Structure formats: structure tokens, C-alpha cells
């Protein structure tokens, strides 16, 4: 079975799907949000931080993600270095998050002899393309819990987040479809969509 990449905008169901796939297939789940938090704490000069500048964080973490994916997915683990790092059969991961630049990552992964990422990864995109700003705003108010960073935002602040998220869903749909991801809309019947995805991974 291939490694799995789940990319998409916030609140599209990436973490939930990753947990479901982990339960079924046993892949280790790597949260890009958590990786970003680690970089932000360990190497602040790299400007890889949560809740800061989404575009810059995505740009700055792309080299790490590309080399990580290439090193842990190439048949011999070689890549830019001229020696093998070995392979552990059955050692599989799920990488999930929003800070993904698919074009830049594909370019780096190519240096590991992976010309088409779809041959080595299940590339899954999740968006909520059918939800407008008002629907996203209502979803925040209805489903947020105290653990969500949006929970205590004012109405105006939350509406601004919903406006940004609606635009980001459209942006991610375009980027992901252009770079080989199979994109699923989780605006409606999310459980059915997840069941379809789980059946499709190989």
C-alpha cells in the first residue's frame, strides 16, 4: 500500500479522515500543523509558524515536506545523496494538513526518482467548495468547541475567517486538481465521502 497525503483547507475533515485511515490501515499519522508548531518552537528564524502568514509558512515548509516524502518513499531512499538509506517494507505514513504547496513538493520529490507522485502516494484533496461565507460562518458558530482557536472570536472576526476560508477552499481546489490530487468535496454527506475515499486507497 502507498503512503497517503491528505491536503485541503481548514475544517474540511483532514484530521478526521486521517484517523479513520489510521484505524483501518495502521498508517502513522503526521500532522503538518504539529510539524509547523515544532519548527516554530525549535527554529523560529525559519519563519514556519502557526496562525501567522499562511502563504509564507506554506512556502517555507515545502522543502522539508518534499525531502521527507521523497526520502521515506523512494525505493532505495537515495535522492540527492548518492547512497542508500535503506527501506523498511510496510512502514507507511499519512501526511495531513493545509500548509502544502503541491507543485513545489512534486519538484523536490522528483529528485528522488519519483516522477509521478501518484505512483507512490494516494493524493487526497478535501475542500468545501459548495459552502459560501454565510454557511461557513454558521458552521463555526454551531460546531466549534472550546478547543478550536475560532471559538472565542467576535462575530466580525469570525466572519472575516469565513471569508478567507471560502476563498482558500477555491484556491486549494485549483492547486490540488492541477497537481494530481483526487479532490473530494466534503460540503455535504461527509461520512459517505469518507467511506468512498477509504475504499479507494491502494
Question: What does each of the following model-derived ranges do?
Answer:
Residues 10:
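The conserved Walker
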Residues 13:
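Conserved glycine(s) of the Walker
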Residues 17, 21:
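Hydrophobic positions on the alpha1 helix immediately C-terminal to the Walker A/P-loop
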Residues 167-202:
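NTP-dependent small-molecule kinase module
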Amino acid at each position: 500500500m502507498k503512503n497517503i497525503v491528505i491536503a485541503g483547507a481548514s475544517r474540511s475533515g483532514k484530521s478526521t479522515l486521517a484517523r479513520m485511515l489510521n484505524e483501518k490501515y495502521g498508517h502513522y499519522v503526521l500532522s503538518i500543523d504539529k510539524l509547523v508548531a515544532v519548527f516554530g518552537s525549535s527554529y523560529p528564524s525559519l519563519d514556519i509558524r502557526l496562525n501567522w502568514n499562511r502563504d509564507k509558512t506554506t512556502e517555507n515548509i515545502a522543502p522539508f515536506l518534499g525531502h521527507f516524502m521523497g526520502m521515506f518513499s523512494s525505493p532505495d531512499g537515495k535522492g540527492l545523496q548518492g547512497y542508500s538509506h535503506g527501506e523498511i517494507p510496510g512502514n507507511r505514513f499519512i501526511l495531513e494538513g493545509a500548509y502544502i504547496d503541491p507543485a513545489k513538493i512534486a519538484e523536490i520529490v522528483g529528485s528522488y526518482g519519483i516522477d509521478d507522485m501518484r505512483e507512490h502516494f494516494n493524493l487526497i484533496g478535501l475542500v468545501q467548495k459548495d459552502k459560501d461565507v454565510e454557511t461557513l460562518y454558521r458552521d463555526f458558530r454551531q460546531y466549534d468547541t472550546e478547543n478550536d482557536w475560532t471559538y472565542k472570536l467576535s462575530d466580525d472576526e469570525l466572519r472575516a475567517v469565513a471569508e478567507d476560508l471560502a476563498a482558500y477552499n477555491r484556491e486549494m481546489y485549483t492547486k490540488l486538481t492541477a497537481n494530481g490530487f483526487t479532490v473530494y468535496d466534503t460540503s455535504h454527506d461527509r461520512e459517505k465521502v469518507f467511506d468512498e475515499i477509504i475504499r479507494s486507497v491502494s
